[in-house]
Regions:
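Short, small-residue-biased leader/transition segments that mark boundaries at the very start
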Residues: 1-2
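Surface loop/turn motifs at the tips and blade-to-blade linkers of beta-strand repeat domains
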Residues: 6-11, 61-67, 118-123
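Structural signature of eukaryotic scaffold interfaces centered on beta-propeller domains
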Residues: 9-26, 71-84, 126-143
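Functionally critical, mid-to-C-terminal surface segments that flank or help form catalytic/ligand
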Residues: 13-36, 43-47
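Short beta-strand elements that form the blades of beta-propeller/WD-repeat-like
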Residues: 26-39, 83-95, 137-143
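Conserved active-site loop/cleft motifs that coordinate metal ions or position small ligands
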Residues: 29, 87-92, 101-105, 114-119, ...
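Generic long, charged, amphipathic alpha-helical segments
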Residues: 40-92
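Beta-propeller blade signature
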Residues: 44-56, 99-119
Length: 143
């Protein structure tokens, strides 16, 4: 059943869900946004968002005006029972050309910010899409 629902007035893009829920009802949607810099002069996304489509509640975490986020992906915790039991991961790129980083946030507590940050040695070019593939699934399919 299709139902149109506005989750936020902020401009957002690259919606993602827990991929285990693809093709069936889901509760949580993860996006990126311009955040508090939601104006035409700021041309890069700097905020990750989590939307609960059942309650209408949203959480966000902003990296500030000198950073650009990539598409956020959901990675389920092994053995997870809840749809949002896992992590959110994204590349974060410095606008001044400094090395990029990968951030990991607890999907159930996104507003608390990253629980881990991987500081890369190089600047990864800004891209659009990301994916996560569990190495065990790769090994099963390609061994």
């Amino acid at each position: 059943v299709y139902k149109r629902q506005i989750l936020s007035e902020m401009k957002q893009e690259f919606p993602r869900i827990n991929e285990a829920y693809t093709g069936r009802p889901y509760r949580y949607v993860y996006t990126i946004s311009f955040g508090e810099f939601d104006d035409p002069s700021h041309v890069s996304s700097n905020t990750l968002l989590s939307h609960d489509v059942e309650t209408g509640n949203s959480e966000s975490y902003s990296f500030g005006e000198n950073w650009v986020t990539g598409e956020v992906i959901f990675v389920a915790r092994e053995g997870a029972q809840a749809e949002n039991d896992g992590w959110l991961m994204s590349y974060v790129h410095a606008l001044d050309g400094r090395p990029s980083k990968v951030v990991i946030l607890d999907a159930q507590h996104m507003a608390e910010g990253p629980i881990a940050t991987i500081h890369l040695q190089v600047r990864v070019p800004v891209g659009f899409h990301c994916n996560w593939v569990d190495y065990r699934k790769l090994r099963t399919h390609y061994s």
